[in-house]
Amino acid sequence: MKTLLCRHGRHTEIGYDPGIQNPSIGDEFRRASGLAIVLTVLSFEDKREKVYKELLEIYGTVTPKSARIKYEDLQHMNYLDRFIKETMRLFPAAPLIGRHLTEDVKMGEFILPKGVEIVVPILSVHRNEKYWHNPLIFDPDRFLPEKIGTAYNNYYMPFFLGPRNCIGMKYAMILIKVVLATLIRTFIFKVDKRIQIDEIKLNMDVTLSSVEPIEVKIEKRELR
């Protein structure tokens, strides 16, 4: 609700409001890759500190409570935006999605007949070296405007593609940005040993989650 009011000029803050945000945060992270996976990615020190440096340029070292996130601030979080997109490429909320064919579809030598149900393996597409250079390397800069090409337009689908894509994708991106910006401004995330992307075993269920628990150390930043 705050986001909608802000967008229409009736509210300028996207505050850290427990009454509005907390239920949504838990729900969103269950769908957006799982909190453990997101925190693991945040433990990649070089990438995390790039995000933090960008946030320092916007807010300085004051606490999120003293300098709350405003809607217009989100437009300046360019690296964070790429960081989130790369996380969703490697760990899409929904690793698979079903579709009902309304017409025959030719795939190579085969024809999928109208009326059948198909499954689109989003995770496999996102990690396919045919479409992505070094697909198992976490590289937010692959989403720089000058690098975006056919892979982004045709093979990047964390919210799926076409007229039946996720209607809440813009809201989800805003919410994830606010949550991650708040977490990164407040805490430092570390792991004893850097985990490689291909070492994270995943459950291919309705939503993506890790098979094994992922331990992440959390330290509070010294802020004023």
Go through each PLM region and give its residues:
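Cytochrome P450 heme-thiolate "Cys pocket" and heme-binding signature region
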Residues: 71, 146-176, 201-203, 207
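C-terminal helix/juxtamembrane-tail motif
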Residues: 9, 117, 188, 207-224
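Conserved cytochrome P450 K-helix/beta-meander segment immediately N-terminal to the heme-binding cysteine loop
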Residues: 74, 120-147
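Conserved cytochrome P450 K-helix E-x-x-R motif and the immediately C-terminal K′/meander segment
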Residues: 62, 66-108, 129, 212
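Conserved cytochrome P450 catalytic core segment spanning the I/J/K helices
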Residues: 1-33, 66, 72, 77, ...
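Central I-helix of cytochrome P450 enzymes
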Residues: 3-57, 87, 116-121, 149, ...
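Cytochrome P450 heme-binding "Cys pocket" and the immediately downstream C-terminal segment
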Residues: 45-48, 171-207
